[in-house]
């Protein structure tokens, strides 16, 4: 597990949940490179080693921006109780994504502390918050 792998994994979940599952859109680059049935679980972890840190952060930021736009439109249209094509409610999708971020921010905190001793008590001053 790497910080880059975590970022790409979270970007992948944003793309899958908001663009694909909620909006019904085809996967965008680079997510369109994978076979969802075969690769969905390990693809971000396996391929992140080939990506520059700035590219991974840019991918996550861009994906989060698109997710927020999609979510805003969906909430305006039908609220939290709307049902996605797979039967899940939007409320449940958001709860699952919050849980996923909570788990992985804990992982990131542990990885970061092992690298330089810094803990997740405070984000850097220049850290972008969605």
Task: Describe each model-derived feature in a short phrase.
Residues 39-81, 91-102:
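Acidic/histidine-rich alpha-helical segments that form the ligand environment
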């Amino acid at each position: 597990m790497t910080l880059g792998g975590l970022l790409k994994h979270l970007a992948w979940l944003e793309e899958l949940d908001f663009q694909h599952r909620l909006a019904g859109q085809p996967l965008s680059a680079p997510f369109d490179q994978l076979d969802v049935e075969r690769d969905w679980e390990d693809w971000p972890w396996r391929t992140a080693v080939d990506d520059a840190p700035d590219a991974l952060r840019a991918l996550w930021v861009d994906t989060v921006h698109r997710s927020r736009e999609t979510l805003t439109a969906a909430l305006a249209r039908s609220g939290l109780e709307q049902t996605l094509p797979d039967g899940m409610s939007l409320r449940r999708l958001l709860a699952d994504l919050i849980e996923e971020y909570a788990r992985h921010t804990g992982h990131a905190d542990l990885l970061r502390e092992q690298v330089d001793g810094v803990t997740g008590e405070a984000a850097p001053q220049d850290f972008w918050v969605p």
